[in-house]
Amino acid sequence: MRVLILSADQFEDVELIYPYHRLKEEGHEVLVASFKRGVITGKHGYTVNVDLAFEEVNPDEFDALVLPGGRAPERVRLNEKAVEIAKKMFSEGKPVASICHGPQILISAGVLRGRRGTSYPGIKDDMINAGVDWVDAEVVVDGNWVSSRVPGDLYAWMREFVKLLK
């Protein structure tokens, strides 16, 4: 499967790095998209190569989506093309994994009303206002959406996401 990660500078390092390597370990092709090709830098200084600019992404060419957290989603959600990618993939029932502030992109896409999920507690009100049945749990699976809260939830988050990809 081809998995797309949407992110930008100031991502939460482990929330991008862990799923990237975990999914590659499972044999999936994993590509990172951001505002432009090159390199993005995490909150703690880790750098990641960007394979595609948002404008180059054709969501039909990907089977699943990962939305890491940190400060990056605040900026990514302002990019019309990135939000369009997330909306299309989520609405088509493709597996989507979000953690921490990652759901901010899905909130902007308007796809979460009536869904059950979790996030970083700091955006709980935003999630509820977007129509999410917010739960304080390490991982929540609702159909094609797997959500988690914080880096401590990474193993449970990816364990459930990998199950969806099989």
Curated annotation (Swiss-Prot):
Residues 1-166 form the PfpI endopeptidase domain. The active site is at H101. Pfam families: DJ-1_PfpI (PF01965). Keywords: Cytoplasm, Hydrolase, Protease. It catalyses: N(omega)-(1-hydroxy-2-oxopropyl)-L-arginyl-[protein] + H2O = lactate + L-arginyl-[protein] + H(+); N(6)-(1-hydroxy-2-oxopropyl)-L-lysyl-[protein] + H2O = lactate + L-lysyl-[protein] + H(+); S-(1-hydroxy-2-oxopropyl)-L-cysteinyl-[protein] + H2O = lactate + L-cysteinyl-[protein] + H(+); N(omega)-(1-hydroxy-2-oxoethyl)-L-arginyl-[protein] + H2O = L-arginyl-[protein] + glycolate + H(+). InterPro entries: C56_PfpI-like, Class_I_gatase-like, DJ-1/PfpI, Peptidase_C56_Deglycase. One of its GO terms (biological process) is proteolysis. Disulfide bonds: none annotated. Its main location: cytoplasm. It is found in: Cytoplasm. It is an enzyme of class 3 (hydrolase). GO terms for molecular function: peptidase activity; protein deglycase activity. Its EC number is 3.5.1.124, 3.4.22.-. GO terms for cellular component: cytoplasm. Homohexamer formed by a dimer of trimers that assemble into a hollow ring structure. Deglycase that catalyzes the deglycation of the Maillard adducts formed between amino groups of proteins and reactive carbonyl groups of glyoxals. Thus, functions as a protein deglycase that repairs methylglyoxal- and glyoxal-glycated proteins, and releases repaired proteins and lactate or glycolate, respectively. Deglycates cysteine, arginine and lysine residues in proteins, and thus reactivates these proteins by reversing glycation by glyoxals. Belongs to the peptidase C56 family. This is Deglycase PYRAB04690. It comes from Pyrococcus abyssi (strain GE5 / Orsay).
